[in-house]
């Protein structure tokens, strides 16, 4: 069961920060939005409780790496998150000016509306880009995602994904338990 604190305080405060920065990112040009997003996440991220879990998981996954490498990798995670979050405010312009899907022998079958295909995608930056790229070529695209923990933020993210990216199938998030 969700705690009253999360419902009445934490989620609304996170949502206000989200809307504030989303608006700032929307006003700024894409390049400046990315720089600000990176500045925010690399400055704040290491002080959040989740940072300890990030360090622990990186240390387990890369047990042969030294502490300096682990810390650098964690910083790159925060940098990537800032880059990605700032791009949410610019999804429309990214879709119009930054994405080019080139047809080839494989994509011809995938983009045929009469065929069914499963595409497995990995990403190292903005996880919305593959869905946006596919959506630019065909309308019926779905994705399986994990929703943000905050239901207020999740509502906005769902709207953005529906408008610019994919129909979503979601997995249960920790907030649902």
Task: Set out the residue ranges of the language-model regions.
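Membrane-anchoring hydrophobic helices of lipid-metabolizing enzymes
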Residues: 2-121, 154-160, 165
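Active-site catalytic microenvironments for nucleophilic, acid-base chemistry
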Residues: 27, 133-137, 173
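Conserved beta-strand termini and adjacent loop/short-helix elements that scaffold enzyme active sites
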Residues: 102-104, 144-146, 171
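Catalytic core of membrane glycerolipid acyltransferases/transacylases, capturing the structured
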Residues: 115-168
